[in-house]
């Protein structure tokens, strides 16, 4: 009787075991594919100032210089691939491309040091424990901190922002929702040095952003413009979204990710509530397609949403997906699922759906195509008429990160993120 009961229970567990095995194979196949694509890209990416970013009209890889906001994603992708393969050649390439960015540790001209340094040197330190990398990261955190202003309670994003409504309207203390992503560098610096000033800067910025960047339903504004003298909000606008009052898809993705990460680092329940609210808003939108890959803005062409007169969104009817937003959101939701109890299944299931969509032929390029980038159909900025329906290096990075997080959950049921 005991044998029969045991056999019956074993039969019950077979479907779950098969599904888990199939999902592990799915992750493995995609990581093997990533290794092939990145190996091909390494042949084309030559020179110290040619960090892969997107493709040109002929479908060839286009690089950018180190002081752009995106150079950290390519070496970060190499590190994720090395982590999976253990390939020493990939580690050598990751090391080389990372160390090219060392001068950025002293860069103070914009806020993106988190993307630039933490995606590259952060992964490098995580996988090698090289003390020199830690020192570079701490110095980068010091450089980022110079852009914090106590009057606004924020880290200044760009040095100025020109409104899409009026070319004469220029704001001198813009803060964009993307900036939440750079706080991880500050939290890291406090963790490894014990200097709480980085932590205080990060949570002050997070609190100010939570107060001013969100509507009551947890949808986000893209750009908040502060008066640098009084610290008060002057305007709530968009740079890359459809309209000032719309919700730019990648901006909402940054928000979900940023507050999930901030909860991880602080364990403050306000940030968890915020991250869940932002994720719930995202997933419940009627404009979100069934494959969970959003259009570039959740409110394009909807009544009550009007682009600024200078924005290219005024003169185009393009309805395009932004696969980069889905990649970022998938990675964030895998993490958020681990903090959310019973709600976690909703977030994990959505992340799995996004990941499978991105890995489908609709979004994942054939080997050797797409300029050797992995993910197709991304949008940089329609208002600026740039990078429209192209691959983007950060879509690949967060696709890889989401795969790694899913792999950890399949193997261990939990994430190891520090």
Stretches found by the model and what they are:
Residues 20-418:
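Glycan-recognition and catalytic cores of secretory/periplasmic carbohydrate-active enzymes
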Residues 1-25:
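Bacterial Sec-dependent N-terminal signal peptides
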């Amino acid at each position: 009787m005991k044998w029969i009961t045991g056999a019956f229970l074993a039969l019950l567990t077979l479907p779950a075991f098969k599904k888990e095995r199939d999902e592990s194979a799915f992750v493995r196949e995609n990581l093997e594919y990533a290794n092939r694509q990145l190996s091909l890209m390494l042949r084309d990416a030559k020179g110290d100032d040619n960090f892969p970013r997107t493709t040109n009209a002929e479908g060839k890889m286009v690089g950018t210089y180190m002081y752009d906001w995106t150079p950290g994603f390519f070496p970060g992708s190499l590190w994720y691939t090395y982590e999976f393969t253990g390939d020493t050649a990939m580690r050598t390439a990751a090391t080389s491309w990372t160390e090219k960015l060392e001068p950025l540790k002293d860069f103070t001209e914009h806020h993106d040091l988190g993307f630039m340094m933490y995606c590259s040197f952060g992964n490098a330190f995580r996988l090698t424990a090289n003390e020199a990398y830690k020192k570079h990261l701490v110095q980068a955190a010091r450089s980022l901190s110079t852009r914090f202003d106590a009057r606004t309670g924020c880290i200044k994003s760009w040095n100025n922002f020109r409104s899409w409504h009026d070319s004469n309207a220029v704001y001198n203390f813009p803060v964009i929702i993307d900036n939440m992503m750079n706080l991880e560098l500050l939290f890291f610096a406090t963790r490894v040095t014990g200097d709480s000033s980085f932590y205080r800067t990060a949570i002050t910025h997070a609190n100010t952003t939570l107060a001013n960047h969100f509507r009551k339903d947890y949808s986000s504004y893209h750009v908040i413009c502060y008066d640098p003298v009084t610290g008060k909000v002057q305007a709530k606008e968009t740079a890359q979204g459809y309209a000032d009052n719309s919700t730019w898809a990648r901006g909402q993705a940054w928000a979900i990710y940023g507050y999930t990460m901030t909860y991880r680092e602080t364990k403050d329940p306000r940030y968890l509530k915020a991250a869940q609210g932002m994720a719930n808003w995202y997933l419940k939108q009627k404009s979100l397609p069934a494959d969970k890959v959003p259009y570039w803005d959740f409110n394009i062409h909807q009544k009550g949403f009007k682009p600024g007169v200078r924005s290219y969104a005024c003169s185009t009817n393009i309805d395009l997906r932004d696969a980069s937003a889905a990649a970022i959101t998938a990675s964030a939701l895998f993490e958020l699922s681990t903090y959310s109890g019973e709600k976690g299944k909703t977030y994990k299931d959505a992340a799995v759906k996004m990941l499978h969509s991105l890995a489908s032929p609709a979004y994942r390029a054939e080997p050797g195509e797409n300029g050797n980038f992995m993910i197709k159909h991304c949008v940089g900025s329609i208002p600026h008429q740039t990078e429209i329906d192209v691959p983007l290096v950060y879509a690949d990075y967060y696709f890889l990160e989401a795969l790694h997080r899913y792999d950890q959950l399949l193997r261990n049921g939990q994430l190891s993120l520090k």
